[in-house]
Regions:
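Short, small-residue-biased leader/transition segments that mark boundaries at the very start
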Residues: 1-5
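Glycine-rich Rossmann-fold phosphate-binding loop(s) that bind the pyrophosphate
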Residues: 20-21
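N-terminal Rossmann-fold NAD(P) dinucleotide-binding loop
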Residues: 24-25
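Aromatic pocket-lining residues of Rossmann-like dinucleotide-binding sites
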Residues: 31
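Conserved N-terminal Rossmann-fold NAD(P) cofactor-binding segment
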Residues: 39, 43-81, 95, 314-319
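Rossmann-like NAD(P)-binding element
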Residues: 62-123
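Rossmann-like NAD(P)(H) cofactor-binding subdomain of soluble oxidoreductases
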Residues: 96-162
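C-terminal substrate-binding/catalytic lobe of Rossmann-fold NAD(P)-dependent dehydrogenases
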Residues: 142-148, 157-321
Length: 321
């Protein structure tokens, strides 16, 4: 029968990070500074790497808030309020996304059952790429309720879109309200039809700022957002600061039960004709994970693009699971 594990009561001030590569370590560093947690456990297939990161990050504690940070194993993480999974291989030059999927699904098949057999009761936050497929994989392998298995989704892409629009318009990017939805990847959709700046429709605001060539600007900005990860990887081999900030933001919404609307990856049932596929839609995020998805208004073209994105993800999931 194997080991019998007793369900553990959650410690709302504890977080676990599985995978101590660039993204995992940077996320752990961001979470240490966030003040959200008083305990953090790091896990990596390479124990020494986890120990080294725990030591290095711990040495910054005197400049932050008191906290316990250590390397551990699966038994150490079962009372964590949130388990952040960043483990996985990175895409190598010349490698297709499908190659990467198969490699990382294999890695998840060794990680997720360890969490599932301990009857974990917290929130599983999947960050490894391709995040939509791996969130779907985590759903299927863990048997956990759908609301408690979340992917980081297009939270970072949406931040990139807000940043680009803020620069374009010369306004604070926090005043820009616009979402990237669908796949976190090449088939992502910028939901232009519902975009606004502090309640003023985007096109109207653009004209107020002297921009009249909307189609060209939208195409250029969407391409910048879509290609920015490739560009960063070409220049410095990996992206990790932006995604670490996204992880911190999602954890904040969960721990503080903020009911924030964030475009995280979750299972979609029937919205816009999309069924049984994990992709990003704005959702209310709080202590129970995804409380509900929020159907933003999409024009006909955006709906078609979303259905196409869903189809791509569905086919990829079928090939690997």
């Amino acid at each position: 029968l194997g080991d019998v594990y007793k369900r553990q009561e959650l410690n709302n001030r504890k977080v676990a990070v599985i995978g101590c590569g660039f993204v995992g370590a940077t996320s752990a560093f961001g979470l240490m500074q966030s003040g959200l947690f008083s305990e953090m456990v790091l896990i990596d297939a390479n124990t020494e790497k986890a120990e080294g990161e725990a030591m290095d990050i711990s040495h910054g504690i005197p400049f932050a808030r008191p906290m316990k940070i250590y390397a551990g194993g699966y038994d150490d993480i079962m009372d964590a309020a949130i388990i952040v999974v960043t483990a996985g291989a990175n895409q190598k030059p010349g490698e297709t996304r499908l190659d990467l999927v198969q490699k990382n699904v294999g890695i998840f098949k060794s990680i997720i059952p360890e969490i599932a057999k301990r009857d974990y009761q917290g929130i599983l936050l999947i960050v490894s790429n391709p995040v939509d497929i791996l969130t779907y994989t985590a759903h299927k392998l863990s048997g956990m309720p759908e609301n408690r298995v979340i992917g980081s989704g297009t939270v970072l892409d949406t931040a990139r879109l807000k940043y680009e629009l803020g620069e374009h318009l010369g306004v604070d990017s926090r005043s820009v309200h616009a979402f990237i939805i669908g796949e976190h990847g090449d088939s992502e959709i910028a939901a232009w039809s519902s975009a606004n700046v502090s309640g003023i429709p985007l096109n109207t605001f653009c004209e107020m700022r002297g921009h009249f060539n909307h189609d060209d600007s939208m195409e250029r900005i969407a391409a910048n957002v879509r290609n920015s990860a490739y560009e960063i990887i070409a220049k410095k081999n990996a992206t990790y600061y932006g995604i670490a900030m996204s992880v911190k933001r999602i954890c904040e919404a969960i721990v503080r039960d903020e009911k924030s609307i964030l475009p995280v990856s979750g299972m979609i049932h029937g919205m816009y004709g999309v069924e049984d596929v994990v992709l990003s839609m704005p959702a209310i995020v709080g202590k129970n994970g995804i409380e509900r998805q929020v159907p933003i208004s999409l024009d006909e073209d955006e709906q078609k693009q979303l259905q196409k994105s869903a189809q791509i993800l569905k086919e990829m999931a079928e090939q690997v699971l």
